[in-house]
């Protein structure tokens, strides 16, 4: 009896050591858009995604930003387009209106829209792309040209999925080949 109790205690302790104490339910990959701006004007500017649905989830604190540049982004609301970060989305969206240290703008999380326009607001005024862009891949990289006010380059679905396929196929074949050689 004592032996069974000791075995049970050891099993319970092992289970407690192996099982994590906290669970991370939201740890999977999230869709993302990275935008590189070329030919940008000198000085501070903001870049945001314009979406067709107004939202009630505040994605930024307006007190941290220049009100004049924010107003340039919000002026598109009269045309039925709403700034995703500056105006809010129905679900959370992460990003920043200012460029990151590497000069890119990154938007991610569940609030990332499938179709959007790019809007920029700078010291000389605001502008937005004429046509909406529709994401076709999970991680999208865009190049936005300030002078032409257009998206000049986007991630190719064939290239993206081709690289993803090869990056999983080659290691899988190498591991399976190694196992076949070892146990063959």
PLM feature spans:
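A short, amphipathic beta-strand motif
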Residues: 31-39
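Positively charged n-region of N-terminal signal peptides that target proteins for export
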Residues: 1-7
């Amino acid at each position: 009896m004592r032996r069974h109790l000791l075995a049970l205690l050891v099993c319970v302790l092992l289970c407690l050591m192996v099982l994590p104490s906290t669970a991370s339910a939201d740890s999977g990959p999230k869709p993302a858009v990275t935008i590189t701006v070329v030919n940008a004007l000198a000085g501070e500017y903001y870049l945001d995604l314009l979406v067709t649905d107004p939202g009630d989830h505040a994605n930024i604190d307006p007190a941290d930003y220049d009100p004049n540049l924010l107003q340039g982004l919000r002026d598109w609301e009269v045309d039925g387009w709403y700034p995703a970060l500056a105006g809010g989305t129905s679900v959370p969206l992460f990003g920043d209106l200012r460029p990151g240290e590497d000069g890119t703008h990154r938007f991610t999380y569940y609030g990332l829209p499938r179709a959007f326009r790019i809007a920029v607001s700078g010291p000389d005024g605001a502008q937005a792309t004429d046509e909406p862009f529709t994401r076709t891949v999970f991680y999208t990289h865009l190049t936005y040209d300030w002078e032409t006010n257009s998206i000049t380059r986007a991630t190719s679905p064939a290239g993206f999925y081709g690289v993803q396929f090869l990056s999983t196929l080659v290691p899988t074949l190498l591991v399976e080949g190694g196992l076949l050689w070892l146990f063959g």
